[in-house]
Curated annotation (Swiss-Prot):
This protein's encoding gene: PhomB'
Cited function: Part of the gene cluster that mediates the biosynthesis of the phomopsins, a group of hexapeptide mycotoxins which infects lupins and causes lupinosis disease in livestock. The role of phomB' within the phomopsins biosynthesis pathway has still to be determined. The pathway starts with the processing of the precursor phomA by several endopeptidases including kexin proteases as well as the cluster-specific S41 family peptidase phomP1 and the oligopeptidase phomG to produce 10 identical copies of the hexapeptide Tyr-Val-Ile-Pro-Ile-Asp.
Source organism superkingdom: Eukaryota
Compartment list: Membrane
Protein name per the record: Phomopsin biosynthesis cluster protein B'
Chief location bin: membrane
Feature: compositional bias, Low complexity: 144-155
Glycan-modified residues: 248
Length: 342
C-alpha cells in the first residue's frame, strides 16, 4: 500500500487530467476528456511521460502493477465512451442539417400558394410568352357537338375566322370512362349533362349544377329548335324530345344563337362549383385551357358586336337605365384550392 501512495504522490509532469485543471478530466462528463485523443489523456507531448516516474518503483510490487493496470483500463473505457459520443453528436448534427434543408424546401414550395405570392404580370418570367389571345371569331373546337353551323356564323360575324384546329386533348387515346354508347354510359354510372351534350363520369358530373342551370336558362332540349340534319330540314319532333333529354341520340343541330355562349358559361359555372366544394376532378371539356380562353374571348366579342348596347341594358322600375359603378379596388390573392368564400 505504501507503493500505491508513492505512485499517487508522483509529480504531475505529464498528467493533465488531475488537479492542474479546474475540471476533472477523469470525469465521464468532461468534454475535455471526450474530445482529446487517448494518447493525451495522461501524456503531454512536450513533457516527459509520467510513466517515467514509475520506472523508479519496484515493478515487482503487485499493488503498484494492479493500480497501473486499472488506471489504463479506465482510460480505455473513457476513450470508448468518447468515440461513441463523437459518433452520436455527428449523427445528430447531420440529421438536424437534413431537417433544416427539408423545412426550407417545404417553405419555398408553399410560398407559391400563400396570399402574398400570387404571380402578377410583373413577377412572371420575361422569357415565358403569355398565352396567345384567340383571334376574333375563333371557331369553336370541333369536339363540341353543339357548335353553330357555317351559315349562322356568316350571318352573325363581321370578321374573318381562324379555323386552326385546337390542340389535342391530353390522353385522348385512353379508353373512355363512360364507354361509347348511351346504354354503356348508364351502366357505368355516368350522368348526362345537356349543356355539354355529353355523358360525364360520376366523379366530375355535378347534378346540382345541371339543375340550377336548367332553372336559370330553361330546358334546352325542349325549348330550343333542334334538327337532325345540318341543312335544318328535318326537325326533331316534340315526341322525340324525351330522347334528347335522356341523352339517347347520336347528333343534333340547332340554330339557336345563344347556345354557344350558354355552353361556355355552363363550363365556367362547373369550374367555380368545383373550387367552391373542393372537388378534385373536372370533365375534360371544361378543364381544357384552350376551351376556357376561347369562351372568354368569344363572349367578349359577341357583347362588343351588339349594334345597340341599350337594347341589352337593364332598366329599373321607372324605366331608367341601370348605372354600374366601378370604384378602384385592391384585391389580395387567395389559394386556388381554398373552399372559403373570399
Amino acid at each position: 500500500m505504501e507503493s500505491i501512495a508513492k505512485a499517487k504522490s508522483l509529480p504531475n509532469k505529464g498528467r493533465t487530467y488531475d488537479s492542474q485543471r479546474p475540471w476533472n478530466r477523469d470525469s465521464p462528463f468532461s468534454f475535455a476528456a471526450w474530445w482529446s485523443t487517448p494518447s493525451t489523456r495522461y501524456l503531454k507531448v512536450d513533457q516527459p511521460s509520467g510513466r517515467d516516474e514509475h520506472d523508479s518503483l519496484d515493478l515487482e510490487d503487485e499493488d503498484v502493477s494492479n493500480y497501473l493496470a486499472s488506471h489504463r483500463e479506465r482510460q480505455k473505457r473513457r476513450a470508448s465512451c468518447a468515440a461513441k459520443a463523437k459518433v452520436l453528436i455527428i449523427g445528430c448534427a447531420v440529421i438536424s442539417l437534413f431537417a433544416i434543408i427539408g423545412a426550407l424546401g417545404f417553405a419555398l414550395g408553399r410560398r407559391a400558394t400563400l396570399p402574398g405570392s400570387c404571380a402578377s404580370p410583373a413577377h412572371q418570367n420575361p422569357h415565358t410568352p403569355p398565352h396567345p389571345r384567340p383571334t376574333k371569331g375563333e371557331a369553336h373546337d370541333a369536339g363540341h357537338s353543339g357548335s353553330h353551323s357555317s351559315s349562322s356564323s356568316t350571318n352573325n360575324h363581321h370578321h374573318s375566322h381562324d379555323d386552326s384546329p385546337p390542340p389535342p386533348h391530353v390522353g385522348i387515346d385512353k379508353p373512355k370512362q363512360c364507354g361509347e354508347s348511351p346504354d354503356e354510359a348508364q351502366s357505368r354510372g355516368c350522368i348526362f349533362e345537356p349543356q355539354l351534350t355529353a355523358w360525364v363520369a360520376p366523379e366530375c358530373a355535378f347534378p346540382a349544377v345541371v339543375a340550377e342551370y336548367q332553372d336559370a336558362v330553361g330546358d334546352m332540349m325542349t325549348e330550343w329548335p333542334w334538327f337532325w340534319d345540318t341543312g335544318l330540314q328535318k326537325a326533331v319532333s316534340p315526341e322525340e324530345f324525351p330522347s334528347l333529354q335522356a341523352g339517347n341520340y347520336s347528333v343534333v343541330y340547332t340554330p339557336y344563337q345563344a347556345s354557344h355562349a350558354l355552353h361556355c358559361l355552363y363550363c365556367w359555372r362547373k369550374v367555380s362549383y368545383a373550387l367552391e366544394h373542393g372537388v378534385d376532378w373536372m370533365d375534360a371539356r371544361c378543364h381544357q385551357f384552350y376551351h376556357q380562353r376561347h369562351c372568354a374571348f368569344f363572349i367578349a366579342d359577341k357583347l362588343l358586336e351588339m349594334e345597340d348596347w341599350r337594347a341589352a341594358a337593364e332598366v329599373d322600375v321607372q324605366g331608367r337605365l341601370t348605372t354600374w359603378t366601378y370604384p378602384l379596388l385592391y384585391h389580395n390573392c387567395v389559394p386556388l384550392s381554398s373552399t372559403m368564400e373570399s
